[in-house]
Curated annotation (Swiss-Prot):
Subunit structure: Component of the ER membrane protein complex (EMC).
Gene Ontology biological process terms in this record: protein insertion into ER membrane by stop-transfer membrane-anchor sequence; tail-anchored membrane protein insertion into ER membrane
UniProt key word Disulfide bond: no
The protein, known as: ER membrane protein complex subunit 2-B
The organism's place on the tree of life at top rank: Eukaryota
Organism: Xenopus laevis (African clawed frog)
Membrane topology listed for this record: Peripheral membrane protein
Amino acid sequence: MSKVSDLYDVTWEDMRDKMKTWREDNYRNSEQIVDVGEELINEHASKLGDDVWIIYEQVMIAALDCGRDDIAMSCLQELRRQFPGSHRVKRLTGLRFEAMERYDDALQIYDRILQDDPTNTATRKRKIAIRKAQGRNAEAIRELNEYLEQFVGDQEAWHELAELYINELDYAKAAFCLEELILTNPHNHFYYQQFAEVKYTQGGLENLELSRKYFSQALKLNNHSMRALFGLYMSSVHIASNPKASAKMKKDNVKYATWATSQIKKAYQLAGRTMTDTQTSLKAVEDMLETLQITPS
């Protein structure tokens, strides 16, 4: 098999820097990470200094993602030799058991870590991930709520809890979690958009109005979000068609829906400039919007 350095004419420093970029930006290009990382470890370990250990960890996790347990185990053994008794390395052992679906073995490791260090957040999250993998959502929700009582500022945990509530069709609690996220990160368009989707799903005039407002705010924060644009259109259409809506409310929402329609068509026209099937794509969008047109009530 050809070396990465030969194929792409790169130095070991280039490969080391690329691994660092992938690590810091949370890339999940696992096969590339394994290929580049393996070559670095096998041929340039002595030049890497202490960086070699974080690369071992990075390659191990990527190898689990690719189903390469042989590489994962090799990396794990090196880390165990270098850091005997390390909670971080023990957690990697648990990750390997998870990849093998040996969940009870993984849980035993995580429980031992938490006995020594009850505040180990990464390990607590792994236990919750196992509950999800086993389809035990009620337990995952309970443990996440307990976790958030101690670590209320953990945005990742709030979002995970929102997703679990959505899966359980508990939209009111999902909306509460998303509101917490909006409060802590008011410039993230995705949270506004997801909150709007939850409110749209709940239905009813009041929820639809909230949905439209939050889709609008998502668009203000990211005017390229087609999902928010379609959401604005759909929520406006449903409000304008709602028999409980006032005449003014219906008139206003017809305007919002019309504006959203024009923006959607414009976006598809711009995106289609380099496409050979521009007219076909645009016609499909127009037909879809036509089927969703506002009907008098």
